[in-house]
Amino acid sequence: MAPARTRVNSLNVAVIGAGAAGLVAARELRRENHTVVVFERDSKVGGLWVYTPNSEPDPLSLDPNRTIVHSSVYDSLRTNLPRECMGYRDFPFVPRPEDDESRDSRRYPSHREVLAYLEDFAREFKLVEMVRFKTEVVLVEPEDKKWRVQSKNSDGISKDEIFDAVVVCNGHYTEPRVAHVPGIDSWPGKQIHSHNYRVPDQFKDQVVVVIGNFASGADISRDITGVAKEVHIASRSNPSKTYSKLPGSNNLWLHSMIESVHEDGTIVFQNGKVVQADTIVHCTGYKYHFPFLNTNGYITVEDNCVGPLYEHVFPPALAPGLSFIGLPWMTLQFFMFELQSKWVAAALSGRVTLPSEEKMMEDVTAYYAKREAFGQPKRYTHRLGGGQVDYLNWIAEQIGAPPGEQWRYQEINGGYYRLATQSDTFRDKWDDDHLIVEAYEDFLRQKLISSLPSQLLES
């Protein structure tokens, strides 16, 4: 579906969050001539990518009254995907400037480089002027076909405002999910969620069990092998007989999921192996969490399914006045944020027409039924994975944008394959240099960069 008509509306829009999703949402909304206020509880842009050495006093982050630390970034974190495919389409994630030694020019750079990229993006498009820093949104609710937004700044001063629309970009890496294992409530050792992991020092000479073997699980388990006595990874995606020593370390083992844990400190795996452990690290993901949102029960979060949402973005009965950017995972995040933001901005201006509420609900119901028929758990509702190409290209079609570049999709597929097959070396060894060249030639052709990087010219 191509854009339906020329722009007709200029609205007052609240954006919640100034991370990677909120920044590009603000830019696209302003491009559609909307007036934008971005609410950000931190003192700077970047959201998830703003590192702090601080962690929460409750290591599992289960206490609802705890002091919340919003970052989940650990000190050694590097990106899981190549930088070429990570960035926004018209602001590529290339080293800026090339000769600045304070920047990380690696293909899989550190979290500090990602934050610097987002700061560059905000500076380039003059987005900071739209942001209210140190301001937390405490309530969002519909009011007379508009939206009431109540916020509170760091001085404790509250403010009530009315907006035509609200775009939720608050991220989903703050409210941890923990593993449910028989006996774990009475297990005597220490437990911590990856949300509160920063550096490995606390695990010196310990036997550590890490639950989860994707992204943070793979990273953290290898990060602590340098100080821990033993590290054992448990994963429910592994067959029940799984037991192997992983390459690249002499004290790292991969297991099937935990069968049970016991008051004497032992942990029994489904493969029959028994370990006497000191600490369990839960690398088990996060919950979608919108404590400020009151829709009178229309929007619910059940087993990590946020709904009902049309194409993961619009609640049919409240669209386009309420929208969500960035819920899907296992995808090209920044690129998806950009496409979703363009769609939301165009729908609010009237340049793109959404289907009727009834048709959107039909599509939501059909999507849920399809996933259930394939036996996919509800908690995977927003997991794109192999469906991301169709999803991203579909949104691009709605706004009249070209589909995603083939090199971009090939890079993410290759990146996930290397992550799964060479978790100890995937960030520093690859076999797709031709895709790097293709990406940079594309940037050059679009005049997004002025020249090819020196390392490409030398190759």
From Swiss-Prot:
UniProt entry tagged with the keyword Oxidoreductase: yes
Record family assignment: Belongs to the FMO family.
GO biological process: floral organ morphogenesis; glucosinolate biosynthetic process; regulation of hormone biosynthetic process; regulation of organ growth
Keyword Signal appears in the UniProt entry: no
Reaction(s) the record says it catalyses: a (Z)-omega-(methylsulfanyl)-N-sulfo-alkylhydroximate S-glucoside + NADPH + O2 + H(+) = a (Z)-omega-(methylsulfinyl)-alkyl-glucosinolate + NADP(+) + H2O
Residues given in the record as NADP(+) binding sites: 212-217
Phenotype when the gene is knocked out: Increased accumulation of methylthiooctyl glucosinolates in seeds.
The protein's Enzyme Commission number: 1.14.13.237
Cited function: Catalyzes the conversion of methylthioalkyl glucosinolates into methylsulfinylalkyl glucosinolates. Specific for 8-methylthiooctyl (8-MTO) glucosinolates.
Keywords: FAD, Flavoprotein, Monooxygenase, NADP, Oxidoreductase
Cystine crosslinks: none
GO molecular function: 8-methylthiopropyl glucosinolate S-oxygenase activity; flavin adenine dinucleotide binding; monooxygenase activity; N,N-dimethylaniline monooxygenase activity; NADP binding
Binding of FAD, residues: 17-22
The protein's name in its UniProt record: Flavin-containing monooxygenase FMO GS-OX5
